[in-house]
Structure formats: C-alpha cells, structure tokens
Amino acid sequence: MSRKCELTGVGVLYGNNVSHSQRKTRRRFEPNLRSVKFTSDITAGKYRLSVNARCISSVEKAGGFDAYILQADDNVLSSNARAIKKKIIQTKTAKSL
C-alpha cells in the first residue's frame, strides 16, 4: 500500500536529519495516514479511505464528505476516490430528475 493520501495526494517527502555538528543523513518524512470510514449522505454508503490527519479536518470544514469530494480536483484524487466521486455525481443527478 502506498504512503499517499487518497483525497489530497500528499505523499512521502525526503530530506535530511541534521545533527548538532551539522552532519546530514537522508531520511523520509511520511504523512500521518489514518484509515477512516466516511459516510456519504447522497449515496447512503460508507467508504474506507486512507487519508492524512490534516485531511480529516479539511473534510469537516468543507461541510462533510460529499461536499469535499465534489469540490476536489480529479488530478489529486486516487482512482478509488474518483470512482466514489463519480458514483456520488450519478446518484445526485438521478435524485434531482
């Protein structure tokens, strides 16, 4: 499983540990990923996604999972999240007809 947020696309960064004597050794900065179950109000379904901790508060701030994923750019979403977004859009248009 990749160390990447499925909603924001945040992944592993690389940098240096710097000691007191200024020696530099390579290291990885990994995102704080959590496996979270989001509930969609439109489709009435539950979806488990691997997201970073900052994204969880962003989803709440946007007004819920449906509002966040509908305004999210398709380029940063994972293939699983894009499929969920497509399902939400289809259900929303079917309910509005």
From Swiss-Prot:
Any single GO molecular-function term of the entry would be:
structural constituent of ribosome
**GO annotations of cellular component type:** ribonucleoprotein complex; ribosome
Q: Does the keyword Ribonucleoprotein apply?
A: yes
Keyword Ribonucleoprotein present in the record's keywords: the answer is yes
UniProt keywords, alphabetically: Ribonucleoprotein, Ribosomal protein
Q: Which GO terms describe its biological process?
A: translation
A Pfam family this chain is assigned to:
Ribosomal_L28
Which top-rank group of organisms is this from? Answer: Bacteria
Signal sequence interval, chain numbering: none
| InterPro entries for this protein | Ribosomal_bL28, Ribosomal_bL28/bL31-like_sf, Ribosomal_bL28_bact-type, Ribosomal_bL28_sf
Q: Give the family per the record.
A: Belongs to the bacterial ribosomal protein bL28 family.
- What HAMAP family does this protein map onto? Ribosomal_bL28
Q: What is this protein called?
A: Large ribosomal subunit protein bL28
